[in-house]
Amino acid sequence: MIDAKSEHKIAPWKIEEVNALKELLKSANVIALIDMMEVPAVQLQEIRDKIRDQMTLKMSRNTLIKRAVEEVAEETGNPEFAKLVDYLDKGAAIVVTEMNPFKLFKTLEESKSPAPIKGGAIAPCDIEVKSGSTGMPPGPFLSELKAVGIPAAIDKGKIGIKEDKVVAKEGDVISPKLAVVLSALGIKPVTVGLNVLGVYEEGVIYTSDVLRIDEEEFLGKLQKAYTNAFNLSVNAVIPTSATIETIVQKAFNDAKAVSVESAFITEKTADAILGKAHAQMIAVAKLAGDEALDDDLKEQISSSAVVATEEAPKAETKKEEKKEEAAPAAGLGLLF
């Protein structure tokens, strides 16, 4: 905290700035420190417009941000919050929001945009210039292209590039001349935006390597974990709000199966037990000779044979219908 003795040595605007930063730091649950040193003014304004309704961005000097963070940590009795200053680096700024750290990180990543590379910068990837017309009339630019090793000539009244050319490999230092040429060609090999240094939420500080996740892979793992937990709950008979219905249904089906197999008649299983006994009786009767059967059994065997004969064509018809339905569907599948 800025005491009275030191107050006269500090510029009033700095005291006001620290107080404003402290109020901002106390205003939200999620606090992020970001690096915006390499962001050109045009791109920065575009980013501000994109994130305006989702978070608050405040730029300040690193020394003032450090002081504000430390004072808030002291005033709130939260030493973990003070550790956020360990992530101050380069041209830092503060972002406060109610978004969770992962959503915040994703939003900031999506707000990034391509930009020209500057002379002296390191190539983030192989930079290739494609063949074709530049759309520019003959002039000094032709010499500039050749000076950086790009094969160029006049073609149909315009400067054209003869062939594809890799002008820089990943990790190369870009010369000022090459940077000018790439910018003139509209080649933007770098992505600029707000880079997360650290995000604080409820005593935990997240860094970008933790926040950068593959969403599809993460959701797949989450679904698998849920399925495994669900199956464990059902099989171990540990009821939860999500599994109680399945557990009860499984218990009912198991009890019903035991009742039918053991011929233990209940209100729910009487029909199944009698049906099973009748089917077994018919099966045994079919094995016996006609002389061992009375007229009633012969009639039942005959009836069961007729029913089986009638059901067989129906089953075949259903199979054919399914095949016919599947054929157009398969054909449509080839269109996508």
Curated annotation (Swiss-Prot):
Residues 311-326 have a biased composition (Basic and acidic residues). Residues 305-336 are annotated as: Disordered. GO terms for cellular component: cytosolic large ribosomal subunit. One of its GO terms (molecular function) is structural constituent of ribosome. The keyword GTP-binding does not apply. It comes from the Archaea. Keywords: Ribonucleoprotein, Ribosomal protein, RNA-binding, rRNA-binding. GO terms for biological process: cytoplasmic translation; ribosomal large subunit assembly. Belongs to the universal ribosomal protein uL10 family. NCBIfam families: PRK04019.1-2, PRK04019.1-5. Forms part of the ribosomal stalk, playing a central role in the interaction of the ribosome with GTP-bound translation factors. Part of the 50S ribosomal subunit. Forms part of the ribosomal stalk which helps the ribosome interact with GTP-bound translation factors. Forms a heptameric L10(L12)2(L12)2(L12)2 complex, where L10 forms an elongated spine to which the L12 dimers bind in a sequential fashion. HAMAP family: Ribosomal_uL10_arch. This is Large ribosomal subunit protein uL10. It comes from Methanococcus vannielii (strain ATCC 35089 / DSM 1224 / JCM 13029 / OCM 148 / SB). The lineage of its organism: Archaea, Methanobacteriati, Methanobacteriota, Methanomada group, Methanococci. The gene is rpl10.
